A protein has these predicted regions:
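A short, N-terminal "cap"/entry segment at the start of jelly-roll beta-barrel domains
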Residues: 1-29, 42, 112-128
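Conserved short histidine dyad/triad with adjacent acidic residue
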Residues: 31-46
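Histidine-centered metal-chelating micro-motifs
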Residues: 40-42, 61, 77, 81-87
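Glycine- and acidic-residue-biased ligand/ion/polar-headgroup-sensing regions
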Residues: 48-60
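Structural motif
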Residues: 59-61, 68, 84, 94
Length: 128
């Protein structure tokens, strides 16, 4: 049986990046990220939790320690558990992302590892 939970609220991770929880089950959860231009979150990663992001509106640069991916509308990226990443709105307007994640791997709960300070300012050119 799948139990639907509806904790619709804003996350407090970064007050300029709005996270809206859509729904959560025992296996997966879904959310929307909304932020204005030239906003980025901190480099971080999740243990026991894969993420998929799809750009609904705007442009998102996904930075990892080894590569950058510039995503346009309807582009999608998979970030595996334990892979550090940073989401950056490098477009000229609002960015809307649809996020999906699993609720843990091999029975282990998902966790967010404390933020890893970014050394790349959002104003640097993005190499695609």
């Amino acid at each position: 049986m799948v139990e639907m939970k509806n904790p619709i609220k804003e996350a407090d991770a970064n007050p300029t990046i709005n996270h809206l929880s859509l729904w959560r089950t025992d296996l997966a959860y879904f959310w929307v990220i909304n932020c204005e231009a030239n906003i980025q979150d901190d480099m971080h990663y999740h243990e026991n939790d894969d993420h998929i992001f799809m750009v609904i509106e705007g442009e998102c640069t996904v930075r990892t320690p080894h590569k950058e991916f510039v995503l346009k509308q309807f582009d999608t990226v998979l970030l595996k558990s334990g892979e550090p990443y940073q989401l950056c709105n490098t477009g000229k307007g609002r960015m809307l992302l649809l996020g999906a994640g699993n609720a843990g791997v091999d029975g282990k709960p998902r966790t967010r590892v404390p933020k890893i300070p970014s050394r790349i300012p959002v104003t640097e050119p993005v190499v695609a």
